[in-house]
Amino acid sequence: LAEQLKIIPLGGLNEIGKNMTVYEYGGEIIVVDCGMAFPGDDMYGIDCVIPDVSYLVKHKNRIRGMFITHGHEDHIGAVPYILKKVNIPIYCTRLTAGLIRLKLEEHGLLKSTKIVTVESGMTVKAGKFSVEFIHVNHSIADSVAFAIHTGLGTVVHTGDFKIDSTPIDGEVIDLARFGELGKQGVLALLADSTNVERPGYTMSERTVGRTFNRLFQGCKQRIIVTTFASNVHRIQQIMDAAAECGRKVAVTGRSMENVTKVAMDLGYMKPPKNTVVDINKIKSMPLEKQVIVTTGSQGEEMSALYRMAFSQHKQIEVGPGDRVIISASAIPGNENTVSRVINELFRKGVEVIYDRADMLHVSGHACQEELKIIHALTKPKYFIPVHGEQRMLQLHKDLALQMGMDRKNIVICDNGDAVEIGARSMKCVPGYAPAGEVFVDGYGVGDVGAVVLRDRKHLAEDGMVVVVLSISAQNGDLLAEPEIITRGFIYVKDSEELLQDLRNLTMSTAEAYRGKRGRDLNELKGAIRSAVSNYLFKATKRSPMVLPVITKL
């Protein structure tokens, strides 16, 4: 068999989140990223969604390692769940490792997992793969792209990136290395499509710092800033701005406290001296000396900002003496929850600053011109747009065509497809690996499927009606009047007539059935279910879930 490299995305295509890509070469496998996605509005009770890794479980003896580009949830969120199924070593940078360790500790997996920290610029040998770590800019520190070297050629996997010429840590993206790889020849490029709809360049993270300085200077109120917990450089800039005008900073919200602790311990966040204080200490200080950094930029229900807005926060009570700055844009789908929190803050007399035009947030993803730079530097033979919804992948393809790429060398695939690259050819094999969604609900992983969700949706929309029936084991006679129990369907006290009709209907259905010989209880249940459902739909235009319960005595 001729040499072949297979690239199999298991998540991250035609969606935002749960990024995961499998590379297979010479009978060996490496996995890049292992993310989760937020549940949709119709996924009742689901905590998060992770990729289906049955393909990896099937081939677990061939996996040589998992490589992580950076520490965002859509790239590391599924790590603990996947490690329970396949225990493989993890290779990543220091901050990413610190954030993964937090997760593994929660799941009791820290002892059994091998995490190897790698500096950008270094190369890791994993079986027949050599994976080179290349520094990039993004909205979390210590992000990398990978150059995956194989016998067939080199694949550049950008991960999430932007080109920031004035990053907070002074570490500019290693464009020179992308250019060198391009000179040596890049077999394929997989690049971030998130911001391909936006022309121009993404603004530098530093512009947000200037906004903070402007909003902090001369402000007489307490300042509360919410942003993504993982945005270490944003939090650093808040601390710097606070110190400059003589304010103290306290952090609240579990994920924010965890991330800032890890980032400070590892030296990625360097707060000015004596600036950071405990949340319980800051309360006794004058309001104009306080800055509070909090979670909740997406309006999440149990987040610290949400609890402040709805008067449920243990330490902080907000009111007219407060200025809240929302330093994040709403992730698509979260707009309603964010405006709910903003409205509640307004109701309490809080000044809320959340305007996009105010340079309160910059994206961590490359816009069109930056993507063109990466394409021009790497000059790939083949191109696979990743990390985006269908329109983004299509637009990224158009951008590559503008850059002079050959149409037949660009492939837009779906999760579970395999892109097979040979010495002279590339083809996409649809549906090569299973790649559905696995739902996490509490401790259960994958035990809630489409059927359970359908039931939850049904219950949420129309409620349920339970029909309880006792019949004689001897002759099938009814022993008592049927009992009707409803939940989430009607208010019983106002609907006695309807319930009596249901009892009568159930009795007549059971009577009709009694005459039948070889009585099958399931048949009776089915008959009652359809009679009651049909009647209720006619009477109320609703279709609750009907559960007949029959006991033989």
Question: Where are the regions that the model predicts?
Answer:
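Conserved hydrophobic residues forming the short capping helix/wall of the S-adenosyl-L-methionine
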Residues: 104, 400, 536
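Solvent-exposed loop and beta-edge segments used for protein-protein assembly and interaction
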Residues: 15, 140, 286, 459-461, ...
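Hard-cation-handling environments
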Residues: 198-327, 331-356, 360-517, 525, ...
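Short glycine-rich phosphate-binding loop at a beta-alpha junction
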Residues: 89, 384, 547-548
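A glycine- and charged-residue-rich anion-binding loop/surface
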Residues: 13, 37-45, 62-63, 354-357, ...
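His/Asp/Glu-rich metal-coordinating catalytic cores
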Residues: 2-67, 72-284, 303-317, 336-340
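C-terminal tails and terminal domains of large nucleic-acid-associated
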Residues: 517-553
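Short Gly/Ser/Thr- and Asp/Glu-enriched loop/turn motifs at secondary-structure junctions
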Residues: 119, 414-416, 542-546
